[in-house]
A protein has these predicted regions:
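Conserved N-terminal phosphate-binding loop of PLP-dependent enzymes in the Aspartate aminotransferase
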Residues: 1-410
Length: 410
């Protein structure tokens, strides 16, 4: 099977490194792509489930732009809604009617939502959620999960991150995932001072298996927080609309106070949302929180179109089924070659690794071999399925994985 080379991408990265810190920053940085020689750095175009790099190589994309692509790149209904709004107005003096329409739609769609607020990135709304909780309770402390990720605001980081100081997370308490006793202990040790508990619906760290909630975990957590007047914040930025259109909490059967949404909300257009209960609406209004482009109407129109299409086709069900089919086949292929692939998390956004080498070096090489054959995988982060991935894509991916295992044996 043909393998790709990346001469144009490499040359462009050298230019980028001259004028941009690290060449490419953040989660697109090449440091996450190991072996680095097996990955492209720059994309030229995208359509459906695929993208093409600047060297003309075609990839079935299982990262989906790290989550925002959910219906397929360049989806006509979403793009047309965006373009129609852009012909009218986007960032202008005054809010758009699209903002009201989108808020109404989310309130109708999500059972716990009585109101909605819009921003751009996931961190915008996780940060806002914590601010609301502190205003509502008059307390300082926030409990989070060790290894949990809620963006790059200083309070969200942990010790050792460049640019953050100890004071930034003085009031953040970290506990282990699924550790109900640890949560109860943290509340007891900080009487009357815990404002919020923030967590993802299930635990999806990097470089480690995803973990589902234990039976009854969320129901017990919800009851404990209600008893102690603590705000329950669900960071649904990554899982949102991939497990349940009504919020991932509905998938697991509990009711948070605030839900943070972003990635799959608008099929790649820049928008995030915080939705919450009536009891927190007044406190949300007391916090002055804004951004230069947070009222942009184009992404709001795109989000409306995206959410309606996701609901129409029952996208969570579609993606879960596609993911299960993909993973079952991959596990079987690995077994045929004498290896063991372990899939964790939801099939619509799984984390995969080979258990034959705990160092991850073998798995990194395997993902790289698949990528340079046309199935874009990362080894450190969960993948994403979209409704655009086809049966043909899945079969092609199986063929690529089979060839990659053969190459690893040579």
């Amino acid at each position: 099977m043909k393998t790709y080379s990346y001469e144009t991408s490499g040359a462009l990265f050298k230019r980028a490194a001259e004028v941009i810190p690290c060449g490419i920053y953040g989660h697109y940085s090449p440091v996450t792509c190991v072996p680095i020689s097996h990955y492209p750095f720059f994309t030229a175009r995208a359509q459906g489930s695929k993208f093409w790099d600047v060297d003309g190589n075609e990839f079935i994309d299982y990262m989906c732009a790290y989550g925002p692509m959910v219906l397929g790149y360049a989806h006509p209904a979403v793009d047309e809604a965006y373009q129609a709004q852009m012909k009218l107005a986007d960032s202008v003096t005054g809010a758009s009617a699209r903002m009201v329409e989108l808020a109404e739609y989310l309130v109708d769609l999500i059972p716990v939502a009585d109101w909605a607020f819009f921003a751009k990135n996931g961190a915008d709304v996780t940060n806002f959620a914590v601010m609301i909780a502190r205003v509502a309770t008059g307390r300082r402390k926030v409990i989070g999960i060790k290894g949990g990720y809620h963006g790059t605001s200083p309070w969200m980081m942990s010790a050792g991150h460049h640019g953050a100081i100890d004071d930034d997370f003085t009031h953040v308490i970290r506990i282990r995932w699924n550790d109900y006793d640890g949560l109860e202990r943290a509340i007891t040790e900080n009487p009357g001072d815990v404002a919020a508990f923030i967590a993802t619906p299930y635990h999806h760290p990097t470089f480690a298996d995803s973990e589902m909630p234990a039976d009854g975990y969320w129901q017990k957590v919800e009851q404990l927080l209600r008893k102690n007047g603590i705000v329950l914040i669900i960071d649904d930025v990554r899982c949102g609309f991939r497990l349940d259109m009504r919020g991932s909490n509905e998938y697991f059967g509990f009711k948070p106070d605030l839900i943070c949404l972003c990635k799959a909300m608008a099929n790649g257009y820049p928008i995030s949302a915080l939705v919450g209960t009536e009891t927190l609406k007044t406190d949300a209004g007391r916090v002055f929180y804004t951004g230069s482009y947070w009222h942009s109407a184009g992404p709001m129109a795109a989000a409306l179109a995206c959410l309606k299409e996701l609901k129409r086709i029952d996208a969570p069900k579609v993606m879960l089924e596609k993911g299960k089919k993909l993973l079952d086949g991959m596990v079987a292929i690995a077994k045929n070659h004498g290896y063991h692939l372990k899939a964790t998390g939801a099939p619509s956004m799984p984390y995969l690794r080979t258990t034959d080498d705990e160092s991850l070096m073998f798995h990194q090489q395997l993902c790289g071999e698949c990528t340079r054959r046309g199935a874009y995988f990362t080894s450190h982060h969960n993948w994403f399925l979209s409704t655009a991935h086809t049966g043909e894509d899945i079969q092609r991916t199986w063929d690529i994985l089979d060839d990659a295992f053969k190459a690893m044996k040579k």
